[in-house]
Amino acid sequence: MSYYQWRVFARDVTVCCVGSVAMGLLLAAAADMAMPKKAQARPSELRMIERTVERAAGTRVLWAKGRTNGCTKSTLLGFYAPDKNTVIMCESNLRNSLPMAIELIKHEGWHAVQFRCNKGRPVLRDDQLRNGMRRKDKAILREAYPKHQHRLEAEARTVSQLPTQHYLAGVEAYCRYRT
């Protein structure tokens, strides 16, 4: 294509450059929204739990927005992936509930402690689990989990109810000699 007027040429180049930059920014924004993030602007209690799990258990904590990184069901709030040694928090499904996010990161973080610091075994005794679990958690356990996962899941549900300082002390204690 040949141009006979410099203005037409300049306009076409400008349109092409602006379009390319706009498309690049749009793709970058879309990719940024889809990628899991480290907790940034989160309340200090949540950040403290996250940092302790990452440091003591050596487990990454990622925050997934939307239906990415395994957060495909709207009912899934988060999970621990032992094969990737990662806790995934399904941020969009938590509905901006700080208490729910805190309890969940404690729960999933404790699964990391069980696997990374205690060889995949629970720490609490059966009587502690029975006395510490809420009635609704006992029902969920029976309905939604295979029997071989009951003790680990019961312990994570029980430990997630602890005050944060006690939870953090437990993580530190059980991961002190992690190999």
Language-model features and meaning:
Residues 68-99, 115-116:
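Active-site scaffold of zinc-dependent metalloenzymes
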Residues 15-28:
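Hydrophobic membrane-insertion alpha-helices, especially the h-region
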Residues 32-57:
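Short N-terminal segments immediately surrounding and downstream of signal-peptide cleavage
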Residues 2-17:
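N-terminal Sec-pathway targeting helices
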Residues 23, 48-51, 57-59, 122-179:
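Metalloprotease/metallohydrolase-associated module, dominated by Zn2+-dependent proteases
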Residues 35-40, 90-95, 99-100, 142-147:
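Second-shell loop/turn segments in exported
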Residues 109-125:
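Catalytic Zn2+-binding segment of zinc metalloproteases
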Residues 98-113:
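Short alpha-helix carrying the canonical HExxH Zn2+-binding catalytic motif
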